[in-house]
């Protein structure tokens, strides 16, 4: 699933009008599983001069990168953070940790069923097992067209929820402009 959809869904499920800190924790938690990729790919491409083909066909699947992805996509780690946050929810940091972790878990719950040959080790450090889904969010031979329909439905539904929840003009501008982030030139 595309990162903006993860963020929209997490915000639709977990944000609260008037609770800016909570909403930022949700937004950050929704993107943290992909942060390693967003930092690594431009570095490899523009600093190290690695070709796009080598980057996504070789280096992405090499053990160092797969380990980094496992660290950032670990259900046990975010589950532990959610439990700690829940236990400490009376304190501001506990509540923020809880919503950060819940947003990250929402991201992983929607990634798990749509990764085929590029499946993550979501249960690291307890296991290196990967769920190889019959579906993929980008590979047509694994029903990407149908996955895109579901993703679009999540996108539209989440956007409607957020449009109604947050009356601010800047929120509406982001919701209108966000689809542009999926256009690949």
Give the location of each predicted region.
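N-terminal membrane-targeting hydrophobic helices
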Residues: 1-183
């Amino acid at each position: 699933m595309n990162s903006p959809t993860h963020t929209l869904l997490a915000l639709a499920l977990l944000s609260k009008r008037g609770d800016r800190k909570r909403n930022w924790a949700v937004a950050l938690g929704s993107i943290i599983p992909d942060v390693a990729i967003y930092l690594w790919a431009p570095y490899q491409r523009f600093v190290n001069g690695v070709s796009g083909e080598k980057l996504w066909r070789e280096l992405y699947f090499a053990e160092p990168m797969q380990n980094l992805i496992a660290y950032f996509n670990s259900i046990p780690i975010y589950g532990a953070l959610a439990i700690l946050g829940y236990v400490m929810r009376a304190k501001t940091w506990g509540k923020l940790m809880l919503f950060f972790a819940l947003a990250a878990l929402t991201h992983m719950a929607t990634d798990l069923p749509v990764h085929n040959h590029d499946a993550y080790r979501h249960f690291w450090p307890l296991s290196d097992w990967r769920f190889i889904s019959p579906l993929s969010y980008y590979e047509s031979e694994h029903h990407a067209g149908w996955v895109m329909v579901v993703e679009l439905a999540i996108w539209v539904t989440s956007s409607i929820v957020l449009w109604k929840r947050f009356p601010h003009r800047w929120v509406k501008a982001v919701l209108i402009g966000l689809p542009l982030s999926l256009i690949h030139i």
